[in-house]
Amino acid sequence: MLTITSYFGFLLAALTLTLALFIGLNKIRLI
């Protein structure tokens, strides 16, 4: 159970980081 929770947390963090980076690049291109 702990492994599944840890994996899910890692996946969520990776998705959030990717989304933040994507938004950041879009803002840079808009400027």
UniProtKB/Swiss-Prot annotation:
Organism: Oryza sativa subsp. indica (Rice)
Classification lineage: Eukaryota, Viridiplantae, Streptophyta, Embryophyta, Tracheophyta
Name of this chain's protein: Cytochrome b6-f complex subunit 6
Similarity comment text for this entry: Belongs to the PetL family.
Membrane topology listed for this record: Single-pass membrane protein
One GO molecular-function entry: electron transporter, transferring electrons within cytochrome b6/f complex of photosystem II activity
Positions of transmembrane segments: 4-24
Described purpose of this protein according to its UniProt entry: Component of the cytochrome b6-f complex, which mediates electron transfer between photosystem II (PSII) and photosystem I (PSI), cyclic electron flow around PSI, and state transitions. PetL is important for photoautotrophic growth as well as for electron transfer efficiency and stability of the cytochrome b6-f complex.
Keyword Transcription regulation tagged: no
